[in-house]
A protein has these predicted regions:
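Glycine/threonine-rich ATP-lid/beta-loop region of ATP-binding domains
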Residues: 540-543, 547
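Hydrophobic alpha/beta core scaffold segments
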Residues: 555-559
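N-terminal localization/anchoring segments of enzymes in phospholipid and broader phosphate metabolism
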Residues: 1-530, 548, 552, 564-687
Length: 687
C-alpha cells in the first residue's frame, strides 16, 4: 500500500462503518429525545445486519473466487478487509452495549425497566413461571443436536436458545427457536412497564423443556446469513418468467451460508466449537452481545409512552407554496417547472398529477420506472386508474431491488392485471432511475410532462427521507426521457444524450468532463467550483478527478451522508476539498450535482450516487435544472446544509469525523427547511 493511498483513500467498508458510528452517536446524544435515541440504536443494529448480509457476504464470496484480488483504493484483500471489519464492529458493538444500558437506565424514570431473574419480585417470578408454563412452553419446538440428529437449519436473524446438555457420548446441544408467535415483551405486573423479553424467559426455563438432561450452560444465539444473491447466474433459462427467477432467488437467499454468529452469554468452549463447526463459522465471526439480539421491540414504546419529551415534535409535510390548489398540476407545470422537497413538502401534489392524468383526455401515455414502493401505494392505484381510463401505461418494475423483490413481484402482477404494460430492466443492470413521462397530444402538438426524482415513488419514505422531485414541461427533456424509455423497452441502453445524464453510458464521463471544465477555468485563474450532495462516494474515476481538481485549485465542497472513500484536507492533494456528513432526524437521501460558480453554475438532481455501481453499473438519470428559480433554491439549500452546525460532521485529514462546532447560532438544516416550508405554506393559506 503506497503512502498516497493511505492518505487520500479510505476503504469502502470501513468508511461505511464510520457512517454507522455517526448513527450510533445520535443514540448517545442527550439533546435527542430518549425514545428517538432508542430508535437510532435500533437503526444502528439493523444497518449492521444488512451490512453483514450484503457487504460482508460479498467479501466472503470474493475470497472464494479470488482471495488475492485487492480493492482498488486501499489495496486490501478480502481477508484483510474482513479482519479490519470484524475488529471495528466489535469495538462499535461495545459502544452500543453501553449506549443501550444508558438509555434503559434513563427510561426507568418513566417506569420502564427490563427484567431478568435477578431483579424480579416474588410475585413477578410466580407470574412469569405460570406464563411460561401456559403461554410459551406449549408452543416451543425443542430440538436435540448430536451425532444422531442432523443440525437444523437456523433462520436468518431469528433468535434461538442454545442449551449445552450433559452427555457421555460427546457434545449435545438443545435448540429452542424463539418463534415469532410469541409476544416479544412479557409484562408480569398490571399497570406497570416492567418487562421481560420472551427469549430471556425461555432461556431461564429451558431446563424444564430438557428435563431429562442436566443443563451445563446456555445462551441466546442469532445468525446472519449471506444475502448477496447473483441474479445473472440464475438467468440460464431464458424461457423462465423473470418473476419466477426472482422468486427462486429470494428462496435461495434464505439458505445462504452464515457470516456472523451473535451470542448473549459465554458458552462452554467445546459446545461453542461444535456450533461453529456446524455453522461453518470461524472464531472471529463470533460476536458477544450484551444487549438484546434484536432491538426492534423498542418501537412498541412509542405507542405506550406518550410523554412529549420522549419523542421528536411532530412535523407534518406541507403542501408546496408554489402549487395552486385551484389549478391542475399539468397547467401549472406547463407554466413553470415545479420542485418538491421531501419530507418538508408533501408528495400528494405528485400523486395528484397522476390521478389528474387519468382524467385528462389529452393524455396519451404514461411511462414510469419503479424501484421501491410503499406497502399500500397510492401511486400504484393511480397507475391502475390510468390503465382503466384507457391510457397507454408502461411500467418498468425493477424486480432486483434488494429486499423488496417480493413486494415488487406482487406489484408487477397487479399492474399487469390492470392492463399496464410491465417490463423489466436489462439482464445485467438494475434500473435505479426515478423517471416519469406523461405524453399529451393537443391537436397536432405533442407535449411532455417529465418528472425526475432523487428518491423512490414511496409515500412512506417521502416522510422519512430528504429527497427532491422536479416536474417540467420542457420539450427537449421530454424527448430525451422518451428515448430512455424506448431504449429500455427494447432491452437496450441510451448511448448518448444532450441534456439528461443517463448511466451507464453517459453519466460518469459527463461528470468528469464537467470537472475538467472547472480544472481549465482554475488554470486560467478564473472562478472554479465543484459541489455535490450525495449519499456515498466510492467511484475511483470521479474521486481521482476530484483530487486532480483540488491540486489545480478548484474549490470542491462535498456533502456525503454515508461512506466516502476520498479523504479531504490532505496537504498538497485534497486540501481544496471539504467533506461534510449530515446525520439527523431524517435520512439524507437527495443528490445534487454542481459545476461552476455564479451565473455559470450548472446544477443537476439525480438518483445516482458517485459510486461505480450507480455511475456505470445501473441505469440512472440526472436532470439538468434549467429553471432559474429552482436553481437558486437548490443552491440556497446546499449552502444551508454546509452551514449546519447541529447535525453536521466534518471529515478530518486522518479520515475521522468530528462534529462541526462554531460560535454561530445553532442551525439544524433539516429543521430549517421544515420551518421554511411551514412558513411559506402558512402564508399561502392566508392569501
Amino acid at each position: 500500500m503506497s503512502s498516497n493511498s493511505k492518505k487520500i483513500y479510505d476503504n469502502r467498508e470501513l468508511s461505511w462503518l464510520k457512517f454507522n458510528e455517526r448513527v450510533l452517536e445520535e443514540a448517545r446524544t442527550p439533546d435527542v429525545p430518549l425514545l428517538e435515541r432508542f430508535t437510532f440504536a435500533t437503526i444502528f443494529q439493523s444497518n449492521l445486519d444488512e451490512f453483514f448480509m450484503v457487504r460482508v457476504g460479498s467479501l466472503f464470496d470474493q475470497m472464494i473466487i479470488d482471495s488475492k484480488k485487492r480493492e482498488n483504493k486501499t489495496n486490501m484483500t478480502s481477508e484483510e478487509q474482513l479482519e479490519a471489519i470484524f475488529k471495528r464492529v466489535k469495538e462499535l458493538e461495545a459502544v452500543k452495549d453501553k449506549t443501550y444500558k444508558e438509555i434503559m437506565e434513563s427510561l426507568e424514570a418513566y417506569g420502564v425497566k427490563q427484567l431478568d431473574f435477578r431483579n424480579v419480585t416474588p410475585e413477578e417470578e410466580k407470574y412469569l413461571e405460570l406464563y411460561f408454563k401456559h403461554e410459551v412452553k406449549p408452543l416451543l419446538s425443542p430440538l436435540i443436536i448430536d451425532k444422531r440428529h442432523p443440525f437444523p437449519f437456523l433462520q436468518n436473524k431469528d433468535i434461538y436458545a442454545a442449551i449445552h446438555l450433559e452427555s457421555k457420548t460427546g457434545v449435545k446441544i438443545g435448540i429452542l427457536p424463539v418463534s415469532g408467535a410469541f409476544k416479544r415483551m412479557v409484562f408480569p405486573s398490571k399497570n406497570s412497564l416492567r418487562f421481560m423479553l420472551v427469549e430471556d424467559l425461555i432461556l431461564h426455563y429451558a431446563p424444564q423443556v430438557f428435563e431429562n438432561y442436566k443443563v451445563l450452560d446456555k445462551t441466546l444465539i442469532r445468525i446472519t446469513r449471506n444475502a448477496d444473491i447473483n441474479v445473472e447466474e440464475a438467468l440460464f433459462d431464458q424461457d423462465m418468467d423473470f418473476r419466477d427467477v426472482m422468486e427462486e432467488l429470494v428462496k435461495k437467499r434464505k439458505k445462504l451460508m452464515p457470516v456472523r454468529l451473535q451470542i448473549s452469554r459465554n458458552l462452554n468452549s467445546n459446545a461453542l466449537e461444535y456450533l461453529c463447526e456446524k455453522l461453518d463459522i470461524s472464531e472471529n465471526q463470533i460476536f458477544h452481545i450484551k444487549t438484546p439480539l434484536d432491538l426492534s421491540f423498542g418501537f412498541a414504546f412509542s405507542d405506550i409512552l406518550d410523554d412529549e419529551k420522549l419523542h421528536y415534535s411532530k412535523l407534518v409535510p406541507q403542501q408546496s407554496a408554489s402549487i395552486n390548489n385551484y389549478e391542475t398540476m399539468i397547467t401549472q407545470i406547463k407554466r413553470n417547472d415545479i420542485m418538491l422537497s421531501y419530507p418538508f413538502e408533501n408528495i400528494g401534489s405528485f400523486i395528484k398529477l397522476l390521478f389528474e392524468a387519468a382524467e385528462d383526455d389529452n393524455v396519451v401515455s404514461v411511462k414510469i420506472t419503479l424501484y421501491r414502493l410503499a406497502k399500500n401505494s397510492r401511486i400504484i392505484e393511480a397507475l391502475v386508474r390510468l390503465a382503466e381510463a384507457g391510457k397507454s401505461v408502461l411500467v418498468l418494475v425493477e424486480l432486483r431491488a434488494r429486499f423488496d423483490e417480493e413486494n415488487n413481484i406482487g406489484w408487477s402482477k397487479r399492474l399487469q392485471r390492470a392492463g399496464c404494460t410491465v417490463i423489466y430492466g436489462p439482464p445485467s443492470l438494475k434500473v435505479h432511475s426515478k423517471l416519469l413521462l406523461i405524453t399529451r397530444k393537443v391537436g397536432d402538438k405533442i407535449e411532455y410532462i417529465t418528472q425526475v426524482g432523487t428518491g423512490n415513488y414511496n409515500e412512506k419514505t417521502s416522510t422519512l427521507y430528504t429527497d427532491l422531485s422536479v416536474m417540467t414541461s420542457d420539450v427537449e427533456i421530454g424527448l430525451e426521457a422518451n428515448n430512455v424509455f424506448n431504449a429500455l423497452s427494447l432491452g437496450m441502453l441510451v448511448e448518448n444524450t444532450k441534456y439528461l445524464l443517463v448511466a451507464p453510458k453517459c453519466l460518469q464521463n459527463r461528470i468528469t468532463s464537467m470537472i475538467d471544465e472547472q480544472i481549465e477555468l482554475a488554470k486560467q485563474g478564473k472562478p472554479a467550483y465543484v459541489g455535490a450532495k450525495i449519499n456515498s462516494l466510492s467511484d475511483k474515476v470521479i474521486i481521482d478527478k476530484l483530487i486532480e481538481a483540488s491540486c489545480e485549485g478548484v474549490k470542491v465542497e462535498l456533502i456525503v451522508r454515508g461512506l466516502c472513500c476520498l479523504i479531504s484536507g490532505v496537504d498538497g492533494l485534497t486540501d481544496n476539498i471539504s467533506v461534510t456528513s449530515i446525520v439527523g432526524r431524517f435520512l439524507e437521501h437527495s443528490r445534487i450535482y454542481i459545476f461552476g460558480a455564479g451565473n455559470e453554475r450548472r446544477m443537476y438532481i439525480s438518483s445516482a450516487d458517485y459510486m461505480t455501481r450507480n455511475t456505470v453499473c445501473r441505469v440512472e438519470v440526472a436532470l439538468p435544472i434549467r429553471d432559474e428559480a429552482i436553481k437558486q433554491r437548490l443552491w440556497d439549500m446546499f449552502c444551508i446544509m454546509l452551514k449546519d452546525n447541529v447535525k453536521a460532521r466534518i471529515q478530518m485529514p486522518d479520515g475521522k469525523y468530528i462534529r462541526k462546532q462554531n460560535n454561530l447560532h445553532p442551525l439544524d438544516s433539516q429543521i430549517y427547511f421544515y420551518e421554511e416550508a411551514y412558513r411559506k405554506a402558512e402564508n399561502y393559506r392566508k392569501t
